[in-house]
Amino acid sequence: MFKIIKCNQINNKLINKKIEINGWVKKIRNHGKVTFINIRDRYDEAQILVSDEKLLKITSQIKMEYCIKIQGKLNLRPLELVNREMKTGELEIIAENIDIISKCNELPFMIENNNNASDNSKLEYRYLDLRREEQKQKIILRSKVIHIIRNHLTKQDFLELETPTFVKSTPEGARDFLVPSRIHKGHFYALPQSPQIYKQLAMIAGLDKYFQIARCYRDEDSRGDRQPEFTQLDLEMSFIKKENIFKLIENLIFTIFKNSLNITLPKKFKKITYKDAMNIYGSDKPDTRYELLIQDMSKALKQSPFDVFKDTLQNKGTIKALIIKNQAHNFSRSKINSLEEHAKLYKARTLYFTKIENNEFTGGIAKFINPIKKTLIETYSLKNNDLIFFIADLWETACKAIGQIRIKIATELNLINKNIFEFLWIYDFPLFEYDEDTQSYKAAHHMFSMPQAKYINTLESNPSEVLGEVYDLVLNGTELGSGSIRVHTKELQQRIFNIVGFNDKIAEERFGFFLKALEYGAPIHGGIAIGIDRLLMLMTNSNSIKDVILFPKNSFAASPLDKSPSKISNEQLKELNLTIENNKN
């Protein structure tokens, strides 16, 4: 009788015992009268020694990635043949029976080394890509992290609730994925971009602690590393302040990292206001793993004879600068030109520079800086071989553009420590932002966020100045989560709808059911959503969120694996009362 075990269960206690393992052929080496097979399962790998003549005939048919069953006796390897790179490297199974469970076609790429395979090929054969140890461990870690989340929150009396997947389309932000109704012809469901309204309804219902591992869907244009469907930890609590959310999430993430990666994080994360983040780092999701802080030189350069600086300051703009210490020799003119073009991508008019040699400013706009060199050198402790970049523009443009230069320079100078995790809370966000294209206000985060108390009575007088009870969690320069304290009265919610251009009729059409609920004793409540895909990407130091999703889409929101999206039959269209227009243009 053979004992069925997994590869990681092989140990010295089973020596001379009859065992059975099942798995995939990772490696096969034919040495004439002896063949060695390395078999892999989810847990580990093991070496099989085959010397029986009948079995050698079977092994001659076996190729890489065949799925096989091995029965045999566990032996110690000879000392000179011990493989220290394998956990089971001191042991091997002497094969007594071999069954080929299923064959494997010629591989589209090598499993153990598929660096030359295209992304589309790896997605088309994702089930093969997942046999790689690195990829497999990322998916296993994902499962572990989700288990830790559930366990941690359940212990704190959170209820795991499931909000609807078919919801009312309430267009705002990204486009909805729409699902036609067969029963209600001409009507459509939307797939949720987030469970936002429904988790708020759960708070109104009195279910005061909610969480969900939520699937979310956004029909966004192809860009970068976006996925049309993604997973987030969504949670909400009643009768709280933002500090309660901060503490909850800090404890949760501390537990996740400790129990999954054995990494001990600080129990409290740093906090910074949105305005300070923009001024110091040039970003509302700053990477704080390196210094390279932005300087506001508006006051210091007020006396500069440079007309651009004068005009900028007269028009209520600002001058932001980056001081690159002792690195001027590493920046050629072509590299500086490249940085200038990079700044223009972020709406900056241009990027100015100068450097210090022999205690004089030289190059770039040096002639406009030398008249005030003493002030600048003393104020900013400048030294020879220092390089300074300037952007003069309106505040937001100057901050964002110099912030992007900061990131690019830090990357080129290898200043980023990729082995640390820097969490950061950003708070005091503007509640509204002005859209120059539409000449109207829109919600900076979303329309259900609470204004700070001091702005409520004067909300409409200057929406640009209103700060919200809004907060983001940032990890290593990536926005990991976003949340807020929510509006809990119908009157205030309608005022916010009006500011963002939803008159009472539109608000009633889109959100009438929610406004009605706010009239039935809504509690103070707030929450946050944490991107699980992004969290796992950063935890595993992956280049893409595709690496941590079981079956991801490509950059065009399509699946090479199952060829979705796909056309449907005329019969299906007819059932849904739909027709497809052929646009010959």
UniProtKB/Swiss-Prot annotation:
PANTHER family hit by this protein: ASPARTATE--TRNA LIGASE, MITOCHONDRIAL, ASPARTYL/LYSYL-TRNA SYNTHETASE
Encoding gene, per UniProt annotation: aspS
HAMAP family xref list: Asp_tRNA_synth_type1 (MF_00044)
Organism field: Borrelia duttonii (strain Ly)
Name the UniProt record assigns to this protein: Aspartate--tRNA(Asp/Asn) ligase
Binding site for L-aspartate: 172, 218, 445, 486
EC number of this enzyme: 6.1.1.23
Keywords associated with the record: Aminoacyl-tRNA synthetase, ATP-binding, Cytoplasm, Ligase, Nucleotide-binding, Protein biosynthesis
The reaction(s) this protein catalyses: tRNA(Asx) + L-aspartate + ATP = L-aspartyl-tRNA(Asx) + AMP + diphosphate
Pfam (any one): GAD
